A protein has these predicted regions:
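Short, structured segments at the rim of ligand-binding sites
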Residues: 1-430
Length: 430
């Protein structure tokens, strides 16, 4: 019974430092097995998804050395298998990156179908389309993707839908294909660019990452590198929303402001004060915040991973807001939980109508996925009384030391694993 318990009502105030980007790290770690040389990766977030992926890399036969909590050295010279069997991988969406990495380097891969948060069907058909276009035979066999190729040959590939995962996966495989691959209608998210930059630091020839068209000239081999992962855009945005939700004053450090422009713009539209510095952003929530509308879109649009957090902020704003989710079809599952705290939200298909209320009341809620779990925690910190959030394993997949960082901002929150500990918390806090 691991859960967060908190007593809300305190504005969050202070400074918090963003960890490395989990979504970039997942792709970069998979790509690290594409060379026989040492690869040193810094600014790695210490979260459960990353640790599970490192375990899987080790099980393939690579040597994995944790230099410190946020730095790892990987040497894949002695990889002895192209089959990912680790059961933990079935719980991680990004396990599919092993397909592109193994196929690119060894021309063969067998990887369990991905798991992760249940926020939509999220098919991998675009990944498979890309691998087949590069000359690989791809089948789904007993719950796993099985891919084999005699040689990978460059191709001109147009993605039918913009997909971050497919963009990264095909890009990795094409890195060691013969000739120049052209990828069109690709994702432009910061972590796509970061994975491309990492591959280039190992000797890949990738141009255009961050634009609509990526060109990849295949190379015969990749070499070792030292690389530092970019800051986490979504973690930074979560703490920015925390300032709005709790009417606080938070400076988020170790950020790239350009990656946060859509979030900053919407918080400003709500009436928050947003001040950008070179590597910091300060957000000051206001007693009265305005309603506004937003729609999730691929980058540089508003990120779907920030939709629950921003919706919580709007649920406490004046007036009626409209939230349109255009990326995943099941991303409003947290609304029923938020309603237990007093939110007034009606969901009609891919649209949520949010009527702002003056305050939330503490309740026992359950996190349905990673980002919704974080949003429910922030709602609890703004609520009157005590809130417990169950299924926090989702949250810990993507946020490093979440409750510790919140406590540093003045939150009254603890992670407990029994009702007895929860009761002690209530008695101590009063």
């Amino acid at each position: 019974m691991e859960q967060y318990i908190m007593k809300g009502g305190n504005p969050l105030v202070g400074e918090v430092t963003t960890s490395g980007a989990k979504n970039a790290a997942l792709g970069i770690l998979a790509a690290a097995i594409m060379t026989d040389d040492d690869v040193v990766i810094d600014n790695l977030p210490d979260v459960s998804d990353i640790n599970a992926l490192l375990d899987a890399i080790s099980h393939l036969g690579a040597k994995v050395d944790r230099i410190d909590r946020h730095t790892v050295r990987i040497n894949a010279a002695n990889i002895h298998a192209v089959t990912v069997e680790d059961e933990h991988m079935r719980k991680i969406r990004a396990s599919y990156y092993f397909i592109g990495a193994l196929l690119g380097k060894y021309k063969s891969a067998e990887v369990p179908l991905p798991g992760g948060c249940t926020i939509g069907s999220r098919p991998i058909d675009q990944h498979l389309k890309g691998f087949r276009a590069l000359g690989s035979d791809v089948k789904i066999v007993r719950g796993a993707v099985v891919a084999h190729a005699i040689d990978l040959v460059a191709s001109h590939i147009y993605l039918d839908v913009v997909s971050v995962g497919a963009t990264i996966n095909i890009m990795m495989a094409a890195t060691m294909a013969e000739g120049e691959t052209i990828l069109e209608n690709v994702a432009k998210e910061p972590h796509v660019v970061d994975v491309a930059n990492f591959l280039n630091s190992m000797g890949a020839n990738i141009k255009g990452a961050g634009t609509d068209v990526i060109r990849i000239k295949g190379v015969r081999r990749l070499h070792g590198t030292n690389y530092s992962i970019i800051p986490d855009q979504i973690e930074a945005g979560t703490f920015m929303c925390a300032a709005a939700i709790t009417r606080g004053d938070i400076t988020v450090k170790n950020v790239i402001p350009k990656h946060l422009e859509a979030i900053s713009a919407k918080l400003t539209e709500m009436g928050c004060e947003v001040v950008e510095f070179d590597e910091e952003i300060r957000v000051v929530g206001k007693p009265k915040q305005r309603h506004m509308n937003f729609k999730t879109l691929p980058y540089p649009g508003f990120p779907t991973d920030m939709q629950p957090q921003m919706t919580v902020a709007l649920a406490l704003a004046d007036g009626t807001s409209v939230v349109t989710e255009s990326i995943f079809e099941n991303r409003f599952k947290y609304v029923d939980e938020l309603s237990r705290m007093g939110a007034n939200i009606k969901v009609e298909g891919s649209v949520a109508i949010v009527d702002g209320v003056g305050s939330f009341t503490g309740a026992q809620v359950v996190a349905p996925d990673l980002r919704a779990g974080a949003a429910l925690v922030l709602a609890g910190l703004a609520a009157d009384g005590y809130t417990t959030v169950d299924e926090i394993g989702y949250v810990e997949r993507g946020y490093e030391n979440f409750e510790e960082k919140l406590r540093s901002l003045g939150a009254v929150i603890e992670r407990v694993d029994s009702e007895k500990e929860a009761q002690k918390f209530r008695l101590r806090v009063g």
